[in-house]
UniProtKB/Swiss-Prot annotation:
Mg(2+) 1 binds at residues 231, 267, 295, 338. Belongs to the xylose isomerase family. Keywords: Carbohydrate metabolism, Cytoplasm, Isomerase, Magnesium, Metal-binding, Xylose metabolism. It is found in: Cytoplasm. Binds 2 magnesium ions per subunit. It comes from Brucella canis (strain ATCC 23365 / NCTC 10854 / RM-666). It comes from the Bacteria. One of its GO terms (biological process) is D-xylose metabolic process. SUPFAM superfamilies: Xylose isomerase-like. Mg(2+) 2 binds at residues 267, 270, 306, 308. It is an enzyme of class 5 (isomerase). This is Xylose isomerase.
């Protein structure tokens, strides 16, 4: 049943590259086979409940520009929001969605009321999933917006806040499991510090390790089969976050013995804030064995903060999905559009248009990445660059020879290597040919 919010807009269809219909896909064809698998199954698109239906469009200099009929802290408004959200999911045709608890329920007076509201909405989501075929990619708890979390959740100096946050996560994991969620995400927006003058760094890291260990322990206790994911971000809102980037998260997981239990959910915008490319973070996660999922968006490269725009750079998407394919593709993860409309994009159809453009951009990137992989366009030059390590001397360097033996061979054989071209321009031109 239509809520009327989207007017007479019909379900988005694939119309091909020649279409000029802004409410149709030009490149995303869910059933198209890429590397032996349906495009939908490669990309596993998800809609973010928070940016699409809970965000009011505000910024530090102005209040909310969006006027949505569900913008109130009442359970009936939350139910209307659910109706509109699932209508949107059906129109768009993305197979998954994601949410924070605070996105979907009113803010209650206490923990018990929050839990009651969440369970009431989960009852509704269960029915709507059964009716529409929608699936939950991941759930999470909002441990950063309420003023109780000003100094963090897991890293808060007040043990009562730690306990409240832990209890909240427990209810959110329960909700995620009930809804068949394939992952559970932790993003530490307030897990960090503003100044070291009032921060016990060692204690806070240990508390964060304890918190994550409790999450993993509870996952196994209740038989939740999904993946636990950490989402790295270097700053904003906190001056310095403890889950700064993929490398930092991996070091943290290793320190607390969780590297085999937890993977990463990598957001493009957060990679940029950390001074990395999206491709770098994906490649490193793949190399370290902790690649899990993607939050897809982009930042404005001039602004210096997290702008959460829909992706529109095909070469970036091609290199990103090339790393995803090298990792073997998604298992429980997917491509969640952690992207929001611009403040002046007021019309309901703008929400569809933003997602359509993002899905088309990702589809083009995936197809280019698949062709590069099939043709060996990047792997063959890479193999040639490192070919010396496959020879007898290269293998002995990596296992068997001591430092003094290496020195002896260098002198005896008069080894005097000369540099070889890295061929960067050639490789960049190859990528441009595919996109």
């Amino acid at each position: 049943m239509s809520t009327g919010f989207f007017g007479d807009i019909q379900k988005v269809r694939y119309e091909g590259p020649e279409s000029d219909n802004p409410l149709a896909f030009r490149h995303y064809n869910a059933d198209e086979i890429v590397l032996g698998k349906r495009m939908e199954d490669h990309l596993r698109f998800a809609v973010a409940y928070w940016h699409s239906f809970a965000w009011e469009g505000g910024d530090p200099f102005g209040g909310r520009p969006f006027d949505r009929p569900w913008f109130s802290n009442e359970i009936d408004a939350a139910k209307l929001k659910a109706d509109v959200a699932f209508e949107f999911f059906s129109l768009l045709g993305a197979p998954y969605y994601c949410f924070h608890d605070a996105d979907v329920r009113p803010e209650g007076r206490n923990f018990a009321e929050n839990t009651r509201y969440l369970n009431e909405i989960v009852d509704i989501f269960e029915k709507k999933q059964a009716e529409t075929g929608m699936k939950l990619l991941w759930g999470t708890a909002n441990l950063f917006s309420n003023r109780r979390y000003m100094a963090g959740a897991a890293t808060n100096p007040d043990p009562d806040v730690f306990a409240f946050a832990a209890a909240t996560v427990k209810t959110c994991i329960d909700a995620t499991k009930r809804l068949g969620g394939e992952n559970y995400v932790l993003w530490g927006g307030r897990e960090g510090y503003e100044t070291l003058l009032n921060t016990d760094l060692s204690r806070e890291l240990d508390h964060m390790g304890r918190f994550l260990s409790l999450v993993v322990e509870y996952k196994h206790k209740i038989g939740f089969k999904g993946t636990i994911l950490i989402e790295p971000k270097p700053q904003e809102p906190t001056k310095h976050q403890y889950d700064y980037d993929v490398a930092t998260v991996y070091g943290f997981l290793k320190r607390y013995g969780l590297e085999n239990e937890v993977k990463v959910n990598i957001e493009q915008g957060h990679a940029i804030l950390a001074g990395h490319s999206f491709e770098h973070e994906l490649a490193l996660a793949r190399t370290l064995g902790i690649f899990g999922s993607i939050d897809m968006n982009r930042n404005d490269y001039q602004s210096g903060w997290d702008t959460d725009q829909f992706p529109n750079n095909v070469p970036e998407m091609a290199l990103a999905y090339y790393q995803v394919l090298l990792a073997g593709g998604f298992t429980t993860g997917g491509t969640n559009f952690d992207a929001k409309l611009r403040r002046q994009s007021l019309d309901p159809q703008d929400l569809l248009i933003g997602h359509i453009g993002g899905m088309d951009c990702c589809a083009r990137g995936l197809k280019a990445a698949a062709r590069m992989l099939e043709d060996g366009a990047l792997s063959k030059p890479l193999d040639e660059r490192y070919a010396g390590w496959n020879g007898e001397f290269g293998k002995r360097l990596l296992s068997g020879l001591s430092l003094d033996q290496i020195a002896g061979e260098v002198e005896a054989k008069d080894i005097n290597p000369q540099p070889k071209s890295g061929r960067q321009e050639y490789l960049e031109n190859i990528v441009n040919r595919y996109v």
